[in-house]
From Swiss-Prot:
Matching PROSITE patterns: NAD_G3PDH
InterPro entries: 6-PGluconate_DH-like_C_sf, 6PGD_dom2, G3P_DH_NAD-dep, G3P_DH_NAD-dep_C, G3P_DH_NAD-dep_N, NAD(P)-bd_dom_sf
Keyword Nucleotide-binding: yes
Protein name according to UniProt: Glycerol-3-phosphate dehydrogenase [NAD(P)+]
Name of the gene encoding the protein in the UniProt record: gpsA
Length: 329
């Protein structure tokens, strides 16, 4: 695959804007597509995102509401919520050239179908090359040019390398991989585990409990990954252990802060602060997929039960602490 000189970013929220900034700093021609008229007008007039106040858009970034214009780019970064990805890709499908890389930048699993992000892309745009970008990265850090490393994966090795090269800037370092399943699985699973870690923090159960929750959560991530075909080295890498460690340690993570609010006794609507964390949607799907392969995932199961109103936070914690003793894996 040749050089990817133009990049379109679909989604003008915090993460989309941050990735557009990165691509521009890497020397790419960047188009930032935003479907919401108000947000698009603000981006154009103020040259900054409402979600990243104080961060000026790079001068070379062009903002548009025209999907056809964005679709002409050499590669497209799809920075939209996991549950609307299929709708966006379906709209894109007739507009893109064959073998255009479509890079999912959301971390989740589709409700009802149990499809991962690249599977949705493959189904909705069969002529495209599906890819995934994931890893320990907060939008505010990336937008401000702070050092960040992520993984970009595609089954087409040349495509993965070209995407990594296209997004590489002085502070944003992408590693490339062909383990698509491992990369997207790590990001989706950690969303749920970060809620559990946040509950521990919100309940003020202490640093020891938080370390135990994070470590045993990683065991669940590895179990799930092995069962669904991920490579062990990917799960120990940026998109697995790296992302989990970050999101289980700071309220900058929406899933962690959501869990903290639940741990303090807030209801789900109050804890969401107007926008539910992706882990809320992933938890029941993750549980169904774990049950389908008889994977033991007690922490994820407890989170799903709390979010589904089947267990209180205290009952979930007690259930985990009273499980039969076993050898450490």
């Amino acid at each position: 695959m040749g050089s990817l000189n133009s990049i379109a970013v679909l989604g003008g929220g915090a993460w989309g804007t941050a990735l557009a900034q990165t691509a521009a700093r890497a020397g790419r021609k960047v188009t930032l597509w935003e479907h919401d008229a108000g947000n698009a007008e603000h981006l154009i007039a103020a040259r900054e995102s409402r979600f990243l106040p104080g961060v000026r858009l790079e001068p070379s970034i062009q903002v548009t509401r025209d999907l056809a214009e964005a679709a002409r780019a050499d590669a497209l970064l799809l920075v939209v919520p996991a549950q609307v990805l299929r709708q966006v890709v379906t709209s894109l499908q007739p507009l893109i050239a064959p073998r255009t890389p479509l890079v999912a930048c959301a971390k989740g699993i589709e409700h009802g179908t149990h499809r991962f992000m690249t599977e949705i892309i493959a189904e909705a745009a069969p002529a495209a090359i599906p890819a995934i970008l994931s890893g320990p990265s907060f939008a505010a850090d990336v937008a401000r040019g702070l050092p960040t490393a992520v993984t970009i994966a595609a089954t087409d090795a040349a495509c993965a390398q070209a995407l990594a090269q296209a997004m590489n800037s002085g502070s944003f370092r992408p590693y490339h991989s062909t383990d698509v399943r491992g990369v997207e699985l790590g990001g989706a699973t950690k969303n749920v585990l970060a809620i559990a870690a946040g509950i521990v923090e919100g309940r003020q159960l202490g640093a020891s409990a938080l370390a135990a929750m994070t470590t045993r959560g990683f065991v669940e991530l590895v179990r799930f990954g092995k069962a669904y075909g991920a490579r062990i080295e990917t799960m120990h890498g940026l998109s697995g252990l790296g992302d989990l460690t970050m999101c289980c340690s700071t309220p900058q993570s929406r899933n962690f802060s959501f869990g903290m609010a639940l741990g303090r006794g807030e209801g789900i609507e109050s804890a969401a602060h107007g926008k539910l964390a992706e882990g809320y949607y992933t938890a029941p799907v993750l549980l169904e997929m774990a049950q389908a392969k008889d994977i033991d995932m007690p922490i994820s199961t407890a989170v799903a039960a709390v979010l589904g109103g089947k267990l209180s936070v205290d009952a979930a914690i007690e259930g985990l602490l009273t499980r039969p003793l076993k050898a450490e894996e």
